A protein has these predicted regions:
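A Zn2+-metalloprotease active-site environment signal
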Residues: 2-6, 10, 18-300
Length: 300
């Protein structure tokens, strides 16, 4: 009876904790509260910034902040137009360039954006520099507004809940058998659910990123040249998709090539939203006249 109660509790928790990513329509699990994820991510961000070396290159920092402000403004405008104004209070935007040769960037839940200098070096100073940087930052902000961090934490929590149910079901088994099945269970959740979801997150963030970049006035095609550069920098050494938390560069480029024409058609004619300033915690709100054909989306 106890086993059934535990199992039903897990199922009930999952069924009542689903939400939707508005830009893609994908259903997602949401067992962790907004306040919990924001608090935890802020702690992680502050811990990182205590040890990170903030770039002293004023010109490079200004480039990052300019692009990040426009992407942040596009994100807030999108949330406003699509009726997600309650989420706006969760964003206290900060934009940083740190001295790190790794090809990386991130945006914490709550809008803490960090770009590594190695990413800027890869992008270079060509004509597409700002457009490619917008693809990077748009992707990272995409993770934030799609609440991927919250979803990942929920998946981990569900894994723990599932493990509790498994332990109850196996109550009469030997310790050795319990350990063997528990190990198999862990492998199954890692490679059968958690990693594929992470790859879905990456592709979804790619899509949201080009939408935000387009709204902000950047050329979404630069996302393709960005990933071509990333692929070249890796020497073509993409990890096996089954064992990777990230899709291959080839997969990402393929998905972007399919999505970009649709994104340009749907969002390419919106007027550019007002930008943020580095010292303000939220962006200025764009007007929300909803007249764009097909989506009801217009910013101006």
């Amino acid at each position: 009876m106890i086993k059934k109660i535990i199992s039903c509790a897990v199922v009930a928790a999952v069924l009542t904790a689903c939400s939707t990513v508005s830009m893609t329509g994908r259903k997602q699990l949401n067992l962790v509260s907004e306040s919990e994820i924001l608090s935890a991510s802020l702690t992680e961000y502050q811990s990182y910034m205590k040890t990170a070396k903030v770039s002293t290159d004023a010109n490079a920092t200004a480039i990052v902040k300019n692009v990040a402000q426009r992407i942040a403004a596009a994100a807030e405008a999108y949330l406003t137009v699509t009726g997600q104004t309650a989420d706006l209070q969760n964003y206290a935007w900060e934009f940083n360039l740190t001295q790190d040769d790794n090809l990386n960037a991130f945006c914490m839940p709550g809008g803490k954006i960090v770009v590594y200098s190695g990413m800027l070096k890869l992008i270079g100073n060509g004509a597409d520099r700002d457009d490619e940087l917008a693809a990077v930052i748009g992707h990272e902000v995409g993770h934030a507004i799609a609440k991927h961090g919250q979803e990942r934490a929920s998946q981990q929590l569900l894994q723990q809940m599932g493990g509790s149910v498994l332990g109850a079901v196996m109550g009469g088994a030997s310790a050795q058998t319990q350990q063997a099945i528990a190990t198999a269970y862990g492998m199954g959740t890692q490679y059968g659910a958690l990693l594929p979801f992470s790859r879905k997150h990456e592709l979804e963030a790619d899509y949201i990123g080009i939408v935000l970049a387009t709204i902000a006035g950047y050329d979404a095609d630069a996302a393709i040249t960005l990933w071509q550069k990333m692929e070249a920098a890796s020497g073509g050494a993409n990890p096996a998709p089954f064992m990777s938390t990230h899709p291959s560069s080839t997969k990402r480029i393929s998905e972007l090539q399919k999505a970009i024409p649709k994104v340009k058609a749907e969002y390419g004619n919106v007027s550019q939203p007002a930008t943020t300033t580095a010292t303000k915690t939220t962006t200025k709100k764009a007007a929300t006249t909803s007249t764009k054909k097909g989506t009801g989306f217009k910013i101006g």
